[in-house]
A protein has these predicted regions:
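Internal, hydrophobic cores of structured domains that mediate oligomerization or house catalytic pockets
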Residues: 1-76
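Aromatic/basic-lined ligand-recognition segments
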Residues: 43-181
Length: 181
């Protein structure tokens, strides 16, 4: 026998992060009763339910889910895909609009750059979430010692980057390129 359960938040906290944390705790409890996976449809991603067991997260599991758990793991999904006729791999987030944040996309050389972009996107989303700062097309932000990300809107022929919220395309540039445009 198999079944699925749809979880949704019906509490009083207005913070999307707190709502996701509450749902993750329930998913962890359900994994003790045989739940196999947790799917976040708006983030286009899933994880094994066992990841959310309190034994896996440790003594401070709520703090871990709030502060240490990568947003791009489940709350804002990270997806890589190839587009026919285009060299390289597109990497992007989904679901950041649930937090009132933009999704980010980047055109990478290949799948081997996945961790780099996942880390950049996670760090920027976490910064925006915690600081309340806003980013838009035309903005730049330092993401490494000499590396900056420059943001732009998707081009008309980049229809595959459209989503329910704002998507900003990340182009990595070096420090000397910041004021060159």
């Amino acid at each position: 026998t198999s079944a699925n359960i749809i979880l949704y938040y019906k509490g009083y906290d207005t913070s999307p992060l707190e709502q996701y944390v509450a749902l993750a705790v329930v998913a962890g409890a359900l994994s003790n009763m045989g739940a196999v996976a947790v799917l976040n449809e708006s983030a286009h991603t899933s994880l094994p339910a066992g990841v959310f067991k309190s034994q896996e997260l440790g003594k401070h599991s709520l703090e871990m889910l709030r502060e240490g758990f990568p947003l791009t793991s489940l709350f804002c999904g990270f997806v890589k895909y190839e587009v026919e006729g285009i060299e390289g791999v597109w990497m992007r987030t989904y679901g950041a609009d649930c937090f009132g944040l933009p999704d980010f996309a980047a055109h990478a050389q290949g799948h081997h750059e996945g961790q780099k972009y996942s880390d950049i996107f996670n760090n920027v989303l976490r910064y925006l979430l915690e600081s309340g700062a806003e980013m838009a097309a035309g903005h730049t932000m330092q993401v490494g010692k000499t590396t900056f990300m420059k943001l732009r809107d998707p081009l008309d022929d980049e229809y595959y980057l459209q989503g329910p919220g704002t998507t900003l395309v990340v182009e990595l540039i070096e420090e000397d390129e910041c004021n060159a445009h």
